[in-house]
Amino acid sequence: MKVLVLALTALLPCLAASSDADPDKTLGSPNAPIRIEVFSDFECPACKGLHEQILPLLMKDYIIPGKVFLVSREFPLRMHQYSREAAGYATAAARLGKYQQVADTLFLTQVAWGASGKVWDTVAKVLTPAEAGKVQLLAKDPTVLSEVQRDVDAGIAAGINQTPTMIVTHGTSRFPVAGAVNYNLLRSMLDGLLK
């Protein structure tokens, strides 16, 4: 996922915030014709697959060319013991512009920290000591905790009951895409919407 981080660095002028999304949790132009909100859980194996396999393809084919605006949403499932903690750290890191780096490492090392419970140790490895101190404080901040809960509430309101779930919006039409995603099918859907 280092390639993704490098691509994001090159895209900084293109990255923009939606009025209801943290700017560091979005990719692409908010003026893109398609908006995809990805509700994911850092302990979810299918979310890991989406992040590591599908997201780079979406970046290349749709986000960089300005066809898709992607918003990352936290949806920690109760069945996953450490996912809410991970979501809190990732959301706190977003306040410092470090969301993608933290998300990348959480997904990359999901099995290890999911078994050990050492979420913080995993997150701290991709932060400077100064950033780590700020993220630890921010993760306890009520505004960060409420941001995670807002994502969860938005997902529940949209009828989401599994991760990953993508809500694809084109104009006034919204299409849920739940579970593990086949990129060729997703691509067909997006290309159909763009016609």
Residue ranges and their predicted role:
Residues 18-34, 62:
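A short beta-strand-turn-helix
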Residues 52-55, 122-195:
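C-terminal cap of thioredoxin/glutaredoxin-like
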Residues 10, 38-41:
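Processing junctions and N-termini across compartments
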Residues 32, 40-125, 158, 192-193:
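Structural alpha/beta surface segment adjacent to cysteine/selenocysteine redox centers
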Residues 36, 44, 166:
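Conserved S/T- and glycine-rich ATP-binding loop of Class I adenylate-forming
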Residues 2-14:
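Bacterial N-terminal signal peptides
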Residues 27, 113, 177:
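Short clusters of hydrophobic/aromatic residues that line enzyme substrate/ligand-binding pockets
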